Amino acid sequence: MLSGKAAYDLFVYGSLQEPEVVYVLLNRVPDHVSAVLSGFHRFRLKGRVYPTILPDGTGKVNGKVLKGITDDELKMLDEFEDVEYDRKTVEVMLTDTSEKLQVETYVWKNKDDPDLYGEWDFEEWRQHDKEDFVTATKKFLENRRLPEAKTRMDTFKTFFKQDLENGKPLDS
């Protein structure tokens, strides 16, 4: 039985599209459907392996809607997304049915962040960064149990070493 009461629908557009990452965090993979968020752009972040979105008025971001997220699961995901993101309610269109749906998603707090650039690609991430990201996510969960728990940001900073010349993470 799932803990928590309310059921939320959550639009994910980066690493949380990967079932293995979601399973590590929630101990299950919720039902999900493909969706498009209009009026936003998905950015790369210099020195990081995960993306973010910001409203731009014209763009489209492809992703998935995770269905039936509980209060406890949403709390876990809020903690994972950490202080860099705000959770907002947005409208997406489901790819298969064109149905419009109000969902939660995580939006980058700092719209003027100088580290924002380009377009983040999920398939490229899966090929190059997924394995290390899953390992770092497991480390985040381990660190949460410590008396002085580390945030996801702190865990990932210590897990990934950065090649500052090209902004790509290196294995630790």
Curated annotation (Swiss-Prot):
Q: Tell whether Transferase is among the UniProt keywords.
A: yes
- Which InterPro entries does the entry link to? AIG2-like (IPR045038), AIG2-like_dom (IPR009288), GGCT-like (IPR013024), GGCT-like_sf (IPR036568)
Q: Molecular function (GO) terms listed?
A: acyltransferase activity
Keyword annotations for this protein, in alphabetical order, are: Acyltransferase, Transferase
Q: Which Pfam families match?
A: GGACT
- Induction remark: Down-regulated by biological stimuli.
Q: Active site located where?
A: E81 (proton acceptor)
Q: In which tissues is it expressed?
A: Expressed in flowers, leaves, stems and roots.
Annotated signal sequence range: none
Q: Where does substrate bind?
A: Y13, G14, S15, L16, Q17, E18
Instruction: Give EC number(s), comma-separated.
Output: 2.3.2.-
- Name the CDD domains on file: GGCT_like
Q: What family is this protein classified in?
A: Belongs to the gamma-glutamylcyclotransferase family.
Q: What does this protein do?
A: Putative gamma-glutamylcyclotransferase.
What is the designated name of this protein?
Answer: AIG2-like protein C
Q: Which organism is it from?
A: Arabidopsis thaliana
